[in-house]
Every structure is written in C-alpha cells, then in structure tokens.
C-alpha cells in the first residue's frame, strides 16, 4: 500500500510540475502571430518572439544600432505606446526618466510577445539594404584596413558626410594566420603574436561603421576598419567578431550592408571648423573634409589635426596634401606620439589634444566660436573634450562620432 501511495504522490508531483512549466511557458514564451502598428499607418504581422529591433528589420524597417543590438550604443530608440512590457534596467543608462514616461525604449531590448503600437523616426523608412561586392581590402596602417565596396549597378546609398552604414556578417570562422598583411607591418603583428587568434561566430552579427567616402564618390562605399584584437592584459579574450570578418574579405566577396544612418553631420554655418581624429576615426574626418571642400566648395576656415603613433600609422597623406595645395582655407597637421628612429620625424610630437592646444587654440582669438568635429579612441575624445571645456567651448559646438563607446 505504501508503495502504491508513493507512486501516486510521485505522479501527482510530476503532473503538478508539468502544469507549472506549461503555465510559465504560456507567460514567458511567445507563440503565434502578433501585430505591430507603426506610426499609426503600417500594420506588420509576424511571429511572436525575439527582440523588436530584429522583428522590424525582418519587415524591412532598419532602426539604427551602432552596437548591433547589444544595448550599449543607445541609438535604436523607438516610442512604444502599448505592448512591450516594462522598461529594463539595461535601458535606463540611455533613457531619462522623462523619456521613459513618454514611452521611449531601446528596440534591441524590447521583447516581442504581444500586439504593439510603436513610433519610429520617419527617416528610418529611407533605409535600404544592398548586397555589395568587395573591390579592395588593403592595409592602410598596422591595424587598419580600407574596405572599398561596389554598390550594385544603378543603385546609390544616399548618405550625408559623417554618416554610417551597418554591415551584416554570417556565421564564420576566421584564422588570423590567413590574413594577407604586408611585411612592413609584421613587426607589431609578430611582437604581439596576433597570428594566433581565431574568431568563431555561430550566428549572424551586425555592426556599424562610419564612411570614409563622401557623397560625390559615386558607386562605392569606403570604410576604415581597425582590427579589434584582445587587449594585452586579457590575451585570452576573443578578438572582435566583425572586424575579424571584415579583415578576411577578399576582392569579389559579397557583403550585405544597410543604411544610411547618422547624426554626426556638419552644421550649416560660417564658423571655423576644427577636425580632430585618431586611428580609424580618420573615416568620418575624410568624409567631412572632402565633402566641404570638393562638393560644397566651402570657404570656411578648416583645419585637421590627426594623431598617430608613428609614420607607419599615417594614411591618406597624399589626399590631404593635395587638398591643402588646392584649397587655401584648408590646412592639416599630424602629431606622432611615439615616432620610430627610422621615421626621421621633424613634425609635431605628443598627444594630439596637447598639440592642438599649443599650436592652434592657445592663442586663438575665440576658440569658443569654432565648431569641433572629432572621432578617435575614447581616451583621445575624453582628453580633447576636457581641453575644449576648459577653453569655454559650449556643448553645441563639440560634435563627436563616438565609435569607441
């Protein structure tokens, strides 16, 4: 009798647990189709599940997300009028309490479980997707490649200087030992044993890159991509997924991009423009400066200050030298923080924020009246911003392409 009672009790417990799991599943796991109403106009029907960012992309609505949906950039904002659940702690570092009360959410953090009513920026509807072909993918510096893509014939990406596109990467495995690196850059690759790394990605990923090309360069998209290797203090960390994929691309390969996106645009004023860049932050600097001079024929005073470690890290030198020779309102300067003996460098040395201050802004009549456009490593951006604040420059005249977080 006790055995039978035990079996019955065990069966009851198992059934109770099964019912609890089914109940929880009904609450936590979405099933069936849901409808998302967009801007009081479009109604999208799709299977429940996943995040709102991906759900919209599956319907051809590409909300910008510089971090590829990781929740760190804060750019994939939408207004959720109904559905979507409560705002998550991961969103509150990007969204103020007032914005939260108005329904502002990060679409990469919103679960698609029930019918929703949302608003997205109107410019999102102008975003498209293209399958491009790799023209070239050459080293411009030790850790920077210039990826040049051909847009499909008859198409164009209607971007503004300072804008960016998003690149999709399929699941892949990339071995750094297979990279084609010119011998002049091998010294650092050998020093840090970068050939050892392998990047393995099991699902599609999405990342944003600022364009180095400017709108008059028709039919192509140019990017400057820095390889994201593990930091020296954490050598066993995985290398950057998207940068590893991009560095593996060869002429003729197909690449899917979407865009254009952006907010790092030049102001339409007569103020002096001061561009400050470093590393792969060269990309939007080139796009802006070429656009101002070659397309807009701007008469504004324009200076460009670029920081690099050594001459090996300098690129587009001939391009900017030609601009300086052609346009008297443009000058450019490079500062090397760690020049090599063989560089025979007699130009500026030190960190770029100090060089800009000592050689341009220290005795400037009104630095607060200039517009400052910058893009570079986080430490550079922070140093430049502090220097500008100390000079009395207002936030509205400090424009930053913050690709480094």
UniProtKB/Swiss-Prot annotation:
Cofactor(s) it depends on: [2Fe-2S] cluster; FAD
Residue span(s) of domain 2Fe-2S ferredoxin-type: 32-124
Keywords: 2Fe-2S, Cell inner membrane, Cell membrane, FAD, Flavoprotein, Ion transport, Iron, Iron-sulfur, Membrane, Metal-binding, NAD, Sodium, Sodium transport, Translocase, Transmembrane, Transmembrane helix, Transport, Ubiquinone
Enzyme Commission identifier(s): 7.2.1.1
Catalytically driven reaction(s): a ubiquinone + n Na(+)(in) + NADH + H(+) = a ubiquinol + n Na(+)(out) + NAD(+)
Complexes and interactors: Composed of six subunits; NqrA, NqrB, NqrC, NqrD, NqrE and NqrF.
Protein name as it appears in the record: Na(+)-translocating NADH-quinone reductase subunit F
Source organism of this protein record: Neisseria gonorrhoeae (strain ATCC 700825 / FA 1090)
Gene responsible for this protein: nqrF
């Amino acid at each position: 009798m006790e055995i039978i009672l035990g079996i019955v009790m065990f069966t009851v417990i198992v059934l109770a647990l099964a019912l609890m799991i089914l109940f929880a599943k009904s609450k936590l796991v979405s099933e069936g189709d849901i409808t998302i109403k967009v801007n009081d106009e479009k109604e999208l029907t799709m299977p429940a599940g996943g995040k709102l960012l991906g759900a919209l992309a599956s319907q051809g609505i590409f909300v910008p997300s510089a971090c590829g949906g990781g929740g760190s950039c804060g750019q994939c904002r939408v207004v959720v009028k109904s559905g979507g659940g409560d705002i998550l702690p991961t969103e509150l570092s990007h969204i103020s309490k007032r914005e939260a009360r108005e329904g502002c959410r990060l679409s990469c953090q919103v679960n698609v479980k029930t019918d929703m009513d949302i608003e997205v920026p109107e410019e999102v509807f102008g975003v498209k997707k293209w399958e491009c072909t790799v023209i070239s993918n050459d080293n411009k510096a030790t850790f920077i490649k210039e990826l040049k893509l051909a847009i499909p014939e008859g198409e164009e990406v209607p971007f503004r200087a300072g804008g960016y596109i998003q690149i999709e990467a399929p699941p892949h495995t990339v071995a750094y030992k297979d990279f084609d690196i010119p011998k002049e850059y091998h010294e650092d690759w050998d020093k840090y044993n970068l050939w050892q790394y392998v990047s393995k990605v099991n699902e599609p990923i999405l990342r944003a890159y600022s364009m180095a090309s400017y709108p008059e360069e028709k039919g192509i998209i140019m990017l400057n991509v820095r390889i994201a290797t593990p930091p020296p203090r954490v050598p066993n960390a995985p290398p950057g997924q998207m940068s590893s994929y991009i560095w593996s691309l060869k002429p003729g390969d197909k690449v899917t991009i979407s865009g254009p996106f952006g907010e790092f645009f030049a102001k339409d004023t007569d103020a002096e423009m001061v561009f400050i860049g470093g590393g792969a932050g060269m990309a939007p600097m080139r796009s802006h400066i070429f656009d101002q001079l070659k397309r807009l024929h701007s008469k504004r005073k324009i200076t460009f200050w670029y920081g690099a470690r050594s001459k090996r890290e300098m690129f587009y030198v001939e391009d900017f030298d030609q601009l300086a020779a052609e346009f008297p309102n443009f000058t450019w300067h490079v500062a090397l923080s760690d020049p090599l003996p063989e560089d025979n460098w007699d130009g500026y040395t030190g960190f770029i924020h100090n060089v800009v201050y000592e050689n341009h802004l220290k005795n400037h009549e009104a630095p607060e009246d200039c517009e400052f456009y910058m893009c570079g490593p986080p430490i550079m951006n922070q140093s430049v911003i502090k220097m500008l604040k100390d000079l009395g420059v207002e936030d509205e005249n400090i424009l930053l392409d913050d690709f480094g977080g």
